[in-house]
Structures are given as C-alpha cells and as structure tokens.
Amino acid sequence: MKEKTIIIVGGGQAAAMAAASLRQQGFTGELHLFSDERHLPYERPPLSKSMLLEDSPQLQQVLPANWWQENNVHLHSGVTIKTLGRDTRELVLTNGESWHWDQLFIATGAAARPLPLLDALGERCFTLHHAGDAARLREVLQPERSVVIVGAGTIGLELAASATQRSAAQRSAAQRRCKVTVIELAATVMGRNAPPPVQRYLLQRHQQAGVRILLNNAIEHVVDGEKVELTLQSGETLQADVVIYGIGISANEQLAREANLDTANGIVIDEACRTCDPAIFAGGDVAITRLDNGALHRCESWENANNQAQIAAAAMLGLPLPLLPPPWFWSDQYSDNLQFIGDMRGDDWLCRGNPETQKAIWFNLQNGVLIGAVTLNQGREIRPIRKWIQSGKTFDAKLLIDENIALKSL
C-alpha cells in the first residue's frame, strides 16, 4: 500500500515544527513544505529584540539547514500557492505546478492588522513581522530620530525598548538617543496578556528609560511632510521621523477561505488542530480554536506554534494527542526577561521579591491553587512553577511570598 503524502503550507515556526514532529512521530511518507519566503524557516521572536539591536544579526533557523535533506523533507521556498485544491487534493502553484496531497497542514501565520491611516504613509510607516521588516527598521532607528509607536502590547513595548537601546548604543557624546513615544488606546500597557501589577511595573520601567507612553489615546489625523505630523484625540500634535504600529494581527487565511474552510480571522480548528475538513489541519497564528463551550480562542506565541505542530502531527498519524503544558511566553525588554505562564486573568496577585530590584515573581492563586505566574529575571524558577500549575498544587500564600523560604522546598 502506497504511503500517504502530507503537504505543509507555511514557512514559520509551526510549519517547521510540524515537519519535525511528523518525522519524530514515525511518518515515513512523502513530506513537502511550501513557503513564499526564500529563507529557511526562522525564529520570529528575535525580530523585535536581537535582530534590531545587533549590527550584523543572523537569522536563527528553526531547524539546522542540513535537517531537511537528512530527513527527506522537500522544501519549496519562494513559491506562491494559487489554490489548496480541497476538492481535487491537488495543491496548485501560480507557476502552474500541481502537487498531490492526502493530508494538509496550514501554517501560513498572520500579518500585522492594518491601520489605513498610517499605511497611507508608505515606506515611512513600519510594521514588524518578517526578517525584511526588521532589516528596514534597523536602518532607521538612529540617534536623534523621533519614533512614534502605536500599540503598547508585547511587540510595541519590545520595539520601544529596542529603539531606545539601539540608538543609545550608536550615538556619539554630542547626540541624543531616539525620542520614543508610545500611543495606546487602552488604559494600560500589555492589557491583553499581563496582570495588573506587571502592567504597572512595565509602564514605570519604560518611563524611567525615557519612553513617553500616552494611554487612553489614538491618532485622529496624519500629515506627511518633512516629518510625519500626528494629531491625537487629546489634541496634542507629535512630529515623527519614524512611525511603527502593532495593534494585533490579521490571520493569513485567504487560501483557507477560498477553499471554503471555516474562518473567523483565523482558520477554525478543534483541539486536535483539525479543520472542518478531516484531511486538513492548521496551527500557529493562522489558527483559532473552537473550545468545548463554543468560544473561539487564539494563542499567539512561539510555544503555541510548537504545541499545535505536535498535536496536529499526532492527529494526522492517528496517535494519542500529547498533553498540553500551561500557556507560556516570554518578553525581553531592556535588561529584563519576563516569563508568563498559566492564567493571567484576575486582579489579586501576590508578589515575591521587590520589582524595584528587577527581581520578582508574581503568583496567581485561586482558592489556594496556583494557576499562573510571571517571573521577572527569575527564569530558572519557571520549571518548578510549570509543574505546580500542571499538578494543581495548593499553597499557603504567606509561605509562597516569603523569600527566606526557598521555592524548591515548598
């Protein structure tokens, strides 16, 4: 009996890890990966960090260059797909080539959610999603520049930190570093994925670094001239050399939509990463999961891309699905490393340590059960915290925040 052929569509973290997971879980059939990027699949998190800070940064590949050939995975880079061929099981490229598939994994990722008012600025406006975006930004984040960033989510704050650090490192004694202003519609920073005490810490951290953060505000009018003139809802006018925005994502779902798969700013999948077509799976930023209660949930993180790649591979091969660890992601801002794990909801967080010393852990207890945590420059503690959250361990709050008691002894 001829082995089936699996095609992966996409060139990012989820796509590469799906290929790796399929081989690791025993799939020996024909395996193809199609990507519109010419690079080998590379890590996205460094784009807002080291790719902006280093003078000659190198892309960090998800898998070693020799892995693809050694594992007999056929890479098709720099190609454009015309249709997935849901009915015919024939993927068609714009160059006329067609490729048969028995199962399909879609990991086309997402793009920056558009902001037409700023997109009209053309090359003077920046978003960050690909290596080319980081290369363009690296060139313009120079001393003396005025930089306006729209959006104070994770990417917006990382960009603010990187812009401040890069210009400070490059300036001469007579030059000033970038003047960075962040505009945020909400009343706080990182409102979607950080608890209140961490939001307050990050706001203060950026302000101390010289970043101006304007909350409860938005751009109403833009005039393009020698500098970009931005008029805000508050009535204030800003002058900018560089304008960057990051206000969320827009899933790259067009191919799926044209194939009549269920979409809702993302390809709708179940908890096995299966779409409404049992032969088609999806994962990473392009996917949105329908939970048991019918709600749609998207998790935009490096780890989620890895997890869904493993889940989809197991489901495609008819194997038991791996157990999911608690959600986890990290953010590097200035010299700080913050790691977020578990449930970020709720207002009653406990703090172990002193954030003013840039070393602390915030804990989220629900009826004594640890359900979430954030570490500030305490990454070594994530491993035991992950185990505690997975096991539903209960704690005495006073003992948990007592620095005289080692966490590992609890």
UniProtKB/Swiss-Prot annotation:
Give the EC number(s) under which this enzyme is classified: 1.18.1.3
Top-level EC class, please? oxidoreductase
Catalyzed reactions per annotation: 2 reduced [2Fe-2S]-[ferredoxin] + NAD(+) + H(+) = 2 oxidized [2Fe-2S]-[ferredoxin] + NADH
What GO MF terms are annotated?
3-phenylpropionate dioxygenase activity; ferredoxin-NAD+ reductase activity; oxidoreductase activity, acting on NAD(P)H
> Where along the chain is FAD bound?
5-36
Protein residues bound to NAD(+): 146-184
Query: Where is it found, in Gene Ontology cellular component terms?
Result: cytoplasm
Give GO terms for biological process. 3-phenylpropionate catabolic process
Function, in words: Part of the multicomponent 3-phenylpropionate dioxygenase, that converts 3-phenylpropionic acid (PP) and cinnamic acid (CI) into 3-phenylpropionate-dihydrodiol (PP-dihydrodiol) and cinnamic acid-dihydrodiol (CI-dihydrodiol), respectively.
The entry sums up its family as follows:
Belongs to the bacterial ring-hydroxylating dioxygenase ferredoxin reductase family.
Q: How does it assemble?
A: This dioxygenase system consists of four proteins: the two subunits of the hydroxylase component (HcaE and HcaF), a ferredoxin (HcaC) and a ferredoxin reductase (HcaD).
Q: What protein name applies here?
A: 3-phenylpropionate/cinnamic acid dioxygenase ferredoxin--NAD(+) reductase component
Q: Which species?
A: Shigella flexneri serotype 5b (strain 8401)
